[in-house]
Amino acid sequence: MNHTPSPHMTEAAKSGAGLLCGLGLGPDRVRSPDSLTHTPSPSGGTPSSSPPLLLSPGLGCDGIGDWESREELRLRELEEARARAAQMEKTMRWWSDCTANWREKWSKVRAERNRARDEVRQLRQRLDALTKELTGARRERQELAAENEQLRLEAQRVRAEQSSPENASTAPESISSTASTHSNQPREAEIKQDNQDEEGVRDGPGSPEQEPVRDIGTDKLYKQKEMELLEALLRAKSEAPDSWDGRSASSLRSALSRQDRNRLLWEDLAALEEDTSKLNALQLRLDESQKVLLKEREDKHALIKNIEKLEAELSQWKLKYEELNKSKQEALKQLNLLKEVHQDELGRMSEDLEDELGARTNMDKKLAELRTEMERLQVENAAEWGRRERLETEKLALERENKKLRTQMEDLEEQLARKRRQAASALDTDLKTIQSELFERNKELADLRHVHSKVKKQYQEKMAELTHANRRVEQHEAEVKKLRLRVEELKKELGQAEDELDEAHNQTRKLQRSLDEQVEQSENLQVQLEHLQSRLRRQQNPGLFGKMRTSASSRFGPEDADGPPSDPDEDEEEELQLQIP
């Protein structure tokens, strides 16, 4: 039986030969189907000691059905694997989109937080600068108050010198008293106004609306008193010569000498000039102090407006901080939801991995079964090969016997012809015997031919079985190759899934770290905001300054009273430290 193999089947036979070589069969035992045409004939000589293993490309009906069912199963598994891969790609894309959205949100929140931190830092710097300016203004106001007190004492001393019992008369005393009253009234008004301003500053931003009304009224009173003071000074200057004339007349009426009168006159004139120069200097200093007080009032109003602006900005920042807290809570809720979804996805992925591992174990079991079946087929093939060798030897023996019988028949025919020529009479009897012998020989030859045909049929059946076994072996080899490729693909997909799972874990860790950093930064902002609120409360408490002064006066003895004035902010901080346990 000669088969014409196709090139595809020859390639399959070559791959099967490589597989059989790997299983322990040598290349001399593997031949293509076209090698059957070169099998030795009985007349060509004896066969080789290593018989070929025939790999026929044909397939049986059972093999075709199994192959189609397995192919359908493989296609179904391939479609399921593709669907799982597409689902995993979708989930990973969704995760990447979610992480990108979260990164954008966190970047926006971080930018807003940095912006808020910068604005809070700027507000803090402005607040520090304003507090420094306020402390400087308080010090200058205290210094001006001390200077005003000194000027008032000097004016009182000048008035006391003018109203001395030696040289004073009733008119100058009345003028000086009116002038002193007029000069003391605006100073007392200034001192009251300063005290009211200090109380207004201590009251803080809680009462900024009453300040302008009080300042307008006091400015009007202050201007009226200033005009009255200037009129009194002009009257005193105009009435001074008349009073001195009265004094000279009274002195002339006395029993003093002219030299004494001249000396007293010159002394009075010198004292008057000194008093006028002192009054002018005091008036200039008073004008300067008034200008400084006006500037201080303007600075105070500007500071109050700045404090109101800062409070408005602080309220806005509080609202922004509350919004940030709300957005942070929403982000935490969304993050928890994402964590739950991620845990569900991880559970599904773990289930898929377990399914893949189960499929892999099933594939390993199938491979083990195929290996055992292949080994069984190899054993059967070896047994069939032994049977074939035995049949071939029997065939060769029968052919030799046929040759011997043919030679014997030829010899018998020659003897028969010779006997026919030698004796005609004996031919009949001999012919009968020879015919009987020939009939027996022909019968034996027919039996031998019948046996030969049976053996040949058995040989053909065994060859067909062998070709079928070779086809099944080729089919199993192709299935083994496909299964190996499938196992490699599954290994690659498993490695990719593990890498994607590790990336997802790393992304969740990064998100958790960024969340912890945001929480720490929000806590730092909360601490800074509480510190600012405590400082604003310290500035808004008006009763603390009185407590500080009393504590400072009780802390320092009478010998320290003449020392430099202490900083109210430092005293305030010390008082707060004493009050807070």
Swiss-Prot record:
UniProt keyword Coiled coil present: yes
Biased composition (Basic and acidic residues): 185-202
GO CC aspect terms: myosin complex
Biased composition (Polar residues): 161-184
Region (Disordered): 1-61, 156-219, 496-517, 534-581
Name this protein carries in UniProt: Coiled-coil domain-containing protein 102A
Biased amino acid composition, Low complexity: 39-59
Stretches assigned to coiled coil: 70-164, 270-541
Native organism: Danio rerio (Zebrafish)
Entry keyword set: Coiled coil
Chain intervals with Acidic residues compositional bias: 559-581
Domain of life: Eukaryota
Entry-linked Gene3D superfamilies: 1.10.287.1490
InterPro entries registered for this protein in UniProt: Myosin_tail (IPR002928)
